[in-house]
Curated annotation (Swiss-Prot):
Homology family: Belongs to the DNA mismatch repair MutL/HexB family.
GO BP: mismatch repair
Keyword field: DNA damage, DNA repair
GO terms for MF: ATP binding; ATP hydrolysis activity; ATP-dependent DNA damage sensor activity; mismatched DNA binding
CDD domains: HATPase_MutL-MLH-PMS-like, MutL_Trans
Keyword DNA repair recorded: yes
Official protein name in the record: DNA mismatch repair protein MutL
Native organism: Bartonella tribocorum (strain CIP 105476 / IBS 506)
Length: 617
């Protein structure tokens, strides 16, 4: 076997396999070149998903006629000289055009403002023809035909025309978000599929461009980010936890204007939402990271989708801290999608018929009416005085907030008093009723609010546990009779590796034979809890955490699990004072729009929406 030099054309085809995987990659490379050329208008036309035809036109600075041959030659570029660590352009390798020309039919027409005429050059399967004079306006036009006709085997890996067109559209959207001052147009040979008008190149302009791409729901559900550490600045938008998706396609990250899809950045975003979102949902966020070029390596892969930071800890800390602070400062702010889903669930009821009223009439005629028989309580009922509670609704004597209260029996509580204007001015308003033993109905000056009492109190207890834990270990209470919990040997061994972490929460466990755990102490803050259920829930998740590397994650999960077991349960009736106290605590504590599992704690329905349901507006 003889070692020999590969031909330039074969080298370009190999390089094309790294840079050009599908038509969307061709569009990406050509659009990035247009942006680097200072274009303010970029038009893309495709046919058959870009497999047969791609045309990218721009009004950038153009390429001089005497440099066109260099432009389609490998490793020829005007964007860098000898400092590969100080890259300020999207493209810099000089590989895109020669790679495309080696596997397709490429035609490039360009004109600079100094030139009287444009010039044209063609590359077919690596063979260069031209340059020669042509007619064109200022800027560059690149046409690509019959992609991969040199390597037809690659076409077998292409998806349908629709799928490839969607990939091109997604690629343009991802780039367009970072450059709101550029007008983008995407069309087929017969119709325009996307038109993004230019906006101001500032925060407001970015939000307008994002709204063009993400839809009108984005703006009311997003929070602006602006944070800085050392030489790194983070801007962008993070959406409310309840405004989430079932995949990560709505997460966008840009490093010095370059769109990247980096798992490290996705992990940082995930970590920022860890306390407020379920694991099977994904936050919506758009991040712009600006830092000195020497602090980031964009030359990790030819596709330039991955980057490597010199100080990844600084970047992660900045992202997590900025998003969490923004979420905490957002206050009581329900997502618009909840109320819209709620409105969609309402239906105009069918007229009551004699048949539908039959059972009710029979029941009514067979018994006399009384408030108690219909499970209603009056505001004049005599109750025991409320026990003193701390700011989180947890009693100082470590009994849960609602334990031992003399609450009426029934399905609902409806107070007869009318709330004052001061009570209605609170963000979550004044409690007006409790229905189905779990939902608090509150009234504000211009809306109706429904609160899930268990989810809301779970978040309050969770925040209390975290604050208390990081201040000092939680006090525990000895069980009069220790409980033995039977687990599999694997689960028991895994949970016992977290014994010290659990002790910080006041949960004392020790081995008790193969697959068994003895529980001697429980957190006094939680009062009486179901020890068996708590230990089994902790064991189900403990295997995911390492005691050294992910201790904080483990502690947060333990706090969330304990909060779930120690909060107000569904089916517990509350008095007006208790309902209003819960509302005021929700207003005072951050992140109360969702519980620890990411479920919403309340839904707001505006009065205008209610009136619209009844045809009043």
């Amino acid at each position: 076997m003889i070692i020999r030099h590969l031909s330039e054309n074969i080298i370009n085809q190999i390089a094309a396999g790294e840079v050009i995987e599908r038509p969307a990659n061709v569009v990406k490379e050509l659009v990035e070149n247009a942006i680097d050329a200072g274009a303010t208008r970029i038009e893309i036309i495709t046919a058959n998903g870009g497999k047969n035809f791609i045309k990218v036109s721009d009004n950038g600075c153009g390429i001089p006629a005497d440099q066109l041959t260099l432009a389609v030659s490998r490793h020829c570029t005007s964007k860098i000289t000898d400092d590969v660590h100080n890259i300020c352009f999207l493209g810099f390798r000089g590989e895109a055009l020669p790679s495309i020309g080696s596997v397709a039919k490429l035609k490039l027409i360009s004109r600079t403002k100094e030139a009287e005429n444009a010039a044209e050059i063609s590359v077919t399967a690596g063979k260069i023809v031209g340059p020669k004079p042509a007619a064109a306006n200022l800027g560059t036009i690149v046409e690509v035909r019959d992609l991969f006709f040199v390597t037809p085997a690659r076409l077998k890996f292409m998806k349908t025309d629709r799928a490839e067109t969607n990939a091109i559209s997604d690629m343009i959207k991802r780039i367009a978000i970072a450059f709101p001052h550029i007008r983008f147009s995407l069309s087929g040979l017969d119709r325009t599929s996307m038109e993004l008008s230019a906006t101001e190149n500032n925060t407001q302009g970015q939000l307008q461009r994002i709204t063009q791409i993400m839809g009108k729901e984005f703006a009311p559900n997003s929070i602006a980010l602006d944070a800085e550490r050392e030489s790194v600045r983070l801007t962008g938008f993070a959406c409310l936890p309840s405004f989430n998706r079932n995949n990560s396609l709505h997460q966008f990250a840009y490093v010095n204007g370059r769109p990247v899809r980096d798992k490290f950045l996705w992990g940082a975003i995930r970590g920022a939402y860890a306390d407020v979102m379920t694991r099977d949902r994904y936050p919506v966020a758009i991040l712009f990271i600006d830092l000195p070029p020497a602090e980031v390596d964009v030359n990790v892969h030819p596709a330039k989708a991955d980057v490597r930071f010199r100080d990844p800890g600084l970047i992660r800390g900045l992202i997590v801290g900025a998003i969490r602070e923004a979420l905490q400062q957002s206050g009581i702010r329900p997502t618009s999608t909840r109320s819209e889903a709620m409105l969609a669930a309402f239906q105009t009821q069918k007229p009551l018929t004699q048949q539908s009223l039959g059972n009710f009439k029979n029941a009514h005629q067979s018994s006399s009416y009384s408030p108690q028989s219909h499970h209603f309580a009056t505001a004049s009922m005599v109750h025991k005085p409320l026990d003193s509670t701390n700011s989180f609704g947890l009693k100082e004597n470590a009994t849960p907030i609602m334990e031992g209260l003399n609450t009426p029996s029934g399905d609902a509580y409806i107070p007869s008093t009318i709330p004052s204007s001061e009570e209605l001015s609170y963000p979550l308003g004044a409690a007006r009723a409790q229905i189905h033993k779990n939902y608090i109905i509150a009234q504000t000056q211009d809306s109706l609010i429904i609160v899930d009492q268990h989810a809301a109190h779970e978040r309050l207890v969770y925040e209390a546990l975290k604050n208390a834990l990081y201040a000092k270990p939680l006090p525990s209470q000895l069980l009069l009779i220790p409980e033995i919990v039977e687990l599999s040997e694997e689960d028991a061994t895994c949970l016992l590796t977290h014994k010290d972490a659990l002790q910080k929460f006041g949960l004392g466990i020790e081995p008790f034979g193969p697959g068994a755990i003895l529980v001697r102490e429980t957190p006094s803050m939680l009062g009486k809890i179901n020890v068996q259920a708590l230990i089994k829930d902790l064991a189900d998740e403990a295997a995911e955490y390492d005691t050294t590397n992910n201790l904080k994650a483990m502690l947060d999960y333990v706090a969330a699990t304990m909060a779930c077991h120690g909060s107000i349960r569904s089916g517990r009736l509350l008095r007006p004072e208790e309902m209003n106290r819960l509302l005021r605590q929700m207003e005072a504590i951050p992140n109360t729009s969702t519980c620890n599992h990411g479920r919403p704690t309340y839904i707001e329905l505006k009065l205008a929406d209610i009136e619209r349901l009844f045809g009043r507006k």
